[in-house]
């Protein structure tokens, strides 16, 4: 299954919308800002950290994966009919 979700980019976009910086997020996560910057360049992020980011930014980033999963399941079941 190929995914086109780049979770780091989605988080960066949400930070931009909220007019927040990587340094702000780093402080909230109790992480070094350079580590946060590196993390946001990645397509995948550890689920525990993603949960913390979701809570901090008040955005369910897991829903992007749920949507992709449901779309895949629905298109697969449509092919079997």
Residue ranges and their predicted role:
Residues 14, 28, 39, 67:
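Residues in the recognition helix of alpha-helical DNA-binding motifs
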Residues 24-26:
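Short alpha-helical "recognition helix" segments of helix-turn-helix
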Residues 30-45:
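Recognition helix of helix-turn-helix/homeodomain-like DNA-binding domains
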Residues 18, 29, 56-57:
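Core residues of bacterial helix-turn-helix
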Residues 13, 19, 65-81:
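Short, charged recognition helix plus adjacent turn
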Residues 42-55:
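Short, basic-rich loop-to-helix N-cap that marks the start of a DNA-contacting helix
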Residues 1-20:
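A short, Lys/Arg-rich alpha-helix, primarily the initiator
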């Amino acid at each position: 299954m190929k995914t086109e979700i780049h979770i780091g980019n989605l988080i960066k976009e949400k930070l931009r919308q909220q007019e927040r910086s990587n340094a702000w997020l780093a402080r909230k996560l109790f992480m070094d800002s350079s580590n946060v910057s590196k993390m946001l360049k990645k397509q995948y992020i550890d689920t525990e950290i993603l949960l913390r980011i979701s809570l901090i930014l008040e955005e369910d980033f897991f829903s992007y994966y749920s949507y992709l999963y449901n779309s895949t399941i629905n298109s697969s079941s449509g092919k079997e009919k």
